[in-house]
Design a protein with these regions (language model features):
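Conserved nucleotide-binding/hydrolysis micro-motifs of P-loop NTPases
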Residues: 46-48, 95-97, 113-115, 148-154
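Conserved RecA-like helicase motor core of SF1/SF2 enzymes
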Residues: 93-133
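Short glycine-/polar-rich loops that comprise or flank the Walker A/P-loop
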Residues: 34-38, 102-106, 134-144
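A conserved SF2-helicase RecA2
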Residues: 117-123, 127-162
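Conserved helix-turn-beta segment of the N-terminal RecA-like "Helicase ATP-binding" lobe
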Residues: 7-15
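Conserved helicase ATPase core of P-loop NTP-dependent helicases/translocases
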Residues: 21-93
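Flexible phosphate/Mg2+-sensing switch loops adjacent to catalytic phosphate-binding sites
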Residues: 15-25, 133-137
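Conserved strand-helix element at the start of the C-terminal RecA-like helicase core
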Residues: 1-6
Length: 162
């Protein structure tokens, strides 16, 4: 995820971040990054409350977002059907179980050490029944990409790869 975060930033994305200010959750996005497409991290380093708020923003569930934050987000967009607020939602193993995501059109599996059952769980987060009902019928699809690494013969025979 760290490398993909850098790739996104190099391609004009900004991280969707929150902070608590005076007891209220507020956006923590630099002024120069406002208006850029954003990505969010769901890694286990965030508090449970913060992760839940970010997930609700991604899902467009405004009724579960604190009012101060909701007002700020609605200045960006009134929904997140097409990624208007958060376009990319990156999850580590901490996000593989127990959450539902809405309107997710693409799943990219980039961590090589996941067990096949875990991969199916991750895909299942994006393919829940009725999770795409707010989208037009032709957009109610989920494409899954599994990235694999392949070593060359030279790399396999070299002692440098041990």
């Amino acid at each position: 995820i760290g490398i993909f975060k850098l790739v996104l930033e190099a391609n004009g994305f900004a991280e969707f971040k929150l902070k608590k200010e005076g007891g209220n959750w507020v956006l923590d996005i630099k002024e120069e990054d406002r208006g850029k497409p954003t990505f969010a991290l769901y890694t286990g380093t965030e508090s449970d409350e913060e992760k839940e708020i970010v997930r609700n923003v991604f899902n467009g569930d405004w009724k579960f977002i604190p009012p101060t934050l909701e007002a700020q987000i609605k200045l960006i967009s009134g929904n997140n059907l097409y990624g208007e607020v958060i376009k990319v939602f990156m999850i580590t193993a901490s996000g593989a179980e127990g959450i539902s995501l809405k309107n997710t059109r693409y799943v990219h599996i980039m961590e090589p050490y996941w067990h096949p059952v875990r991969i199916q769980q991750v895909i299942g987060r994006a393919r829940r029944i009725c999770s795409h009902q707010e989208l037009p019928e032709e957009l109610r699809t989920v494409d899954v990409f599994l990235y694999l690494m392949e070593f060359s013969e030279e790399q396999l025979s070299s002692d440098d790869t041990i």
